[in-house]
Amino acid sequence: MDSIKNRIMKEYEDLQKHKEENTVTVWMVDNNIRHWKGKIKGPIDTCYQGGIFVIDILIPDEYPFKPPKMKFDTKIWHPNISSVTGAICLDILKNEWTPALTIRTALISLQALMCEPVPDDPQDAVVAKQYMSDIKLFNETAKHWVEEYANPERNFQKKIKELTDMGFTEQQARDALEKNNEDVEKAINYLVGA
């Protein structure tokens, strides 16, 4: 059991060490070694460029012999990702997982999937149908979703407004959000001293 925890911590530390050079970053949820959030940048020259996508990562007790459970928290228009639940259809998160793979590998594979959708093996049939029948409309829709849901500045401004509507100053809201990984609930607890 300790060797599994050591592996998980090593993977986490490796991602932290290289987060500036990576287009993927991770953090633990409530210091839970088995529950992380990941952020991946929308790949350049794709309809996802400019977006920041948050991934929920649950690491099972059987890790690394079983894959991490991942889903998109950020809404995304993609044939292999549910536009409703964020569930992902990716072989390495299912039957192609091997213990030699890492969470970083899985996150980079998600980024690659954003570059090269596989509409023949969809998670979201409606999106896949649009992708195959009208790629121009698909790209326009995906870009709209990036602007609406994966735009970090726009989302940050919404969070600031939510806190200022509660009576906090804009600076208090910014500081609290920055200290709490932009989690509004934690920022509120921080601001009220809970």
Regions found by a protein language model. Give the residues of each.
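Strand-helix-loop interaction patch of compact alpha/beta domains
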Residues: 1-88, 92-101
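Domain-level detector for trafficking modules
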Residues: 3-4, 15-17, 75-165, 174-179
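Short alpha-helical basic/polar micro-motif
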Residues: 53, 108, 171
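Loop/turn elements at beta-strand to alpha-helix junctions within RNA-recognition modules
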Residues: 61, 166-171, 180-182
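Short, Lys/Arg-enriched alpha-helical microdomains
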Residues: 177-194
